[in-house]
Amino acid sequence: MPVSAGAGLRAPHFPALLDGQARFRWVEVHSENYLYGGPARAALLAARAHQPVSLHGVGLGLGNADGLDADHARAIAALADAVEPAAVSEHLCFNRSGARVVNDLLPLPYARESLDLVAANIGRAQDILKRPLLIENIATYIDCRALVDPREAIPEGAFLTALARRTGCGILLDLNNLYVNSINHGVTVESVLADIDPRCVHEIHLAGYSEEDGLLIDTHSRPVHAPVWALYEAYIAAHGARPTLIEWDAELPPVQVLLQEADRAQAILDRLAAPHAAEACHAPA
């Protein structure tokens, strides 16, 4: 995966990319928009000829208690075989309970039981995909800590690291989500990052949030805010360069604004760090 700053590619920006008006270092698309062929898949394959593409899923439901949706995983695998992406990523969440499916990223309680469940689902998904997944931490609006027996609780950062070490997946570290959660739930970003093994972090996401009645919402509809840029600079300075993506999914700006955000991230990468030397993400001896 390119150790550089890319951007999320959404349908309105495809023409600018394909006719050469916009030059991205690499792009990420939402897997579910391209699963079943048609003009959208054709446009994605054309974009793939211009630069690396990463697939980012929102519907695999790795935290679903009744197991992995194998049909959905097979559809993503077929897409990945066609696109040959630089990476395939998903969110650490659930989206189904029995027959009821929710079109959202629902938070998990971080506990031993859920760790076992998610690890099993990731393992099966990776077997179907025949490639490792990157797993992203999500923004949450319900504090699940009260639902967990303190004797079984696992801090979020330790949960992510344990998943990576157990399954061989990587961590997609969303710094905007960490910041949103720190304000909404009173958990410091520093305490979460202290539990995340940087060797397991293969990619970083940056995005903008909105504020409603004192609550921060991960809307992906704004430029990256100053506190998130500060977190990013500090992380890169401490741990080295990582592939970095600017997410912008709502109230889309002109493509040049999106590219300016990516250029700002690239300038930080160029200024603060040499490329990160890949290391194995193993449990400490």
From Swiss-Prot:
<dbReference type="InterPro" id="IPR007801">
    <property type="entry name" value="MbnB/TglH/ChrH"/>
</dbReference>
<dbReference type="Pfam" id="PF05114">
    <property type="entry name" value="MbnB_TglH_ChrH"/>
</dbReference>
<keyword id="KW-0614">Plasmid</keyword>
<comment type="similarity">
    <text>Belongs to the UPF0276 family.</text>
</comment>
<protein>
    <recommendedName>
        <fullName>UPF0276 protein RSp1035</fullName>
    </recommendedName>
</protein>
<dbReference type="InterPro" id="IPR036237">
    <property type="entry name" value="Xyl_isomerase-like_sf"/>
</dbReference>
